[in-house]
Structure formats: structure tokens, C-alpha cells
Amino acid sequence: MAEAVSLKSRWAAGEVTFGAWCMMPGALGVEAVSSLGFDWILVDMQHGCMDYGQALDMIRAADIRGLPAIVRVPWNEPGIVGRVLDAGALGVVAPMIQTADDARSLVDSCRYPPVGRRSFGPVRVGTRDGAGYAFTANDRVAVVPMIETRSALDQVDEIVGLPGVDAALVGPFDLSVALGLPPGDNDGKPAFDDAIKTVVAACRRHGKAVAVLSNAIVAPLRVAQGFQMISVTTDIAALSSASMASLTAVKEKTGTKNAG
């Protein structure tokens, strides 16, 4: 396995990193995107369709290419956080964080004592990194609470200021709904724009990276706003857009139309 580059060190150096958001189960999709130049992949166990075994295989596929695999867990719960880290995830994104106490619980779940309360038992990752994993995990694993609720937005300074939090990820869909807007990127709407500025400013004050679920159209704006961890596609979106482009091109060249 090629050694994965530390995302935390890249963020600390001011680098912008681009990733692919994986929602479909199985290692093949990860293998397909892992040689394209992405800086990381995210395995989405919250809204994606994979179980734990499939997520483990996806992490392993990323490992083979030396691509950092981050997992969005279904919930901020110590059991599943520990399991995805034991599988080899190099970062954990936790959804629906409400308070600084929630974020502190996430840090505790991701860090071995004396920093946190993670249980030691890296069954799979131990075969990858050997006995030294226990001494490097606290420094290598990225802890990323999501800012996507009104409560988290109100407490963003306290959340990102916590020792052990490495980045905050803006969830534009849930955040928009929390602000009374339709789900999605609502740039140009004052409430949404102000929320983005608030999160970015808080992360800068505390020296933390700021992340976001995005797409190829909006990503350049997010770079300009100061985001450093930006997803530019999901596997489902990439499959749909590429399939549609191929189908449209063939129909245009052959003069055929959609059935029905």
C-alpha cells in the first residue's frame, strides 16, 4: 500500500483539497476514481447505500492507491466511529452536530487516551500500519463535525475552537433547510451567504480547515471563499451526468428521440 498523504498536514500548509463523495456500495467505484487525481474520497454511511463490510472494502480500495478515505458516519455515536477508524478511515465526518458538547464527544470517540476515549482494537488497520498505529492515529485521523443546523451555526466558534477538531464541514442542504430556504446551494440569499461567512471566519480564527459538500459548478466559488476540503462530485452524479452525455451525443448523431 502506498502511504496516504496526511490531509491534516496539507490543510495546515494552506492547501485546497478536492474529493469524490461515494454513496454507492462496493470497492469498484472507489477504484475507478482513485487514479483520477482526487485528494481524498468520502464514504457516506449516512445517506449512502453501503453497510459496514462494504465500507471497509471501499476504505481498503482507497488504501491500495494511497488515497485518504474519510467516512461520514450515520450518527455521532462512539461505536460506529470506532469501527470505521478500526477499518482504516483517516477521517470521520459526523452529521447533525448541535453543540460543542456533541463535537467534544466526537473528538473523544476518535482519539486514544489520554486525549480521548477511543477503545484500542485496530483489527484491520493494524494489519495495514502495524504496531505503530497506536502512536500515530491521534495525529493522523481528521475529526470533522458538520455545521448544518441552526444550533451548530450559533455555536460554531465553540465547536471549531475545541482541541482535537481539525475541520468543520458545511452541509449546504440541511443548513439551508434550517435557515428556512430550499435544500441546496443558496448563494445570493443573505441568510445562506451570512452562514457561510460565519463558518469560514470561525475556522480561520481558530486555525481549522473548512470543508463543504459541493459540485464542479459551485466549487470555484467555495475555493474563493476559503474552503480547503471540497467535494466536486458524488459517484451517483458522475454516473448520471456521464451516462446522459453519452446518450445525448448518440441520439444527436443518429437523429433518434426518446421513446414515449
UniProtKB/Swiss-Prot annotation:
SUPFAM superfamilies cross-referenced by the UniProt entry: Phosphoenolpyruvate/pyruvate domain
Residues the record marks as site: Increases basicity of active site His: D86
GO molecular function: aldehyde-lyase activity; metal ion binding
Function in brief: Aldolase which can catalyze in vitro the aldolisation reaction between hydroxypyruvate (HPA) or pyruvate (PA) and D-glyceraldehyde (D-GA). The condensation of pyruvate and D-glyceraldehyde produces 2-dehydro-3-deoxy-L-galactonate. Has weak activity with hydroxypyruvate and D-glyceraldehyde.
Residues the record marks as active site: H47 (proton acceptor)
One Pfam family here: HpcH_HpaI
Taxonomic source organism: Parvibaculum lavamentivorans (strain DS-1 / DSM 13023 / NCIMB 13966)
Protein name in the entry: Hydroxypyruvate/pyruvate aldolase
Tree of life domain: Bacteria
Family indicated by similarity: Belongs to the HpcH/HpaI aldolase family.
GO cellular component: cytoplasm
Catalytic activity from the UniProt record: D-glyceraldehyde + pyruvate = 2-dehydro-3-deoxy-L-galactonate
EC numbers, comma separated: 4.1.2.-
Residues annotated as binding a divalent metal cation: E148, D174
Residues at the site labelled Transition state stabilizer: R72
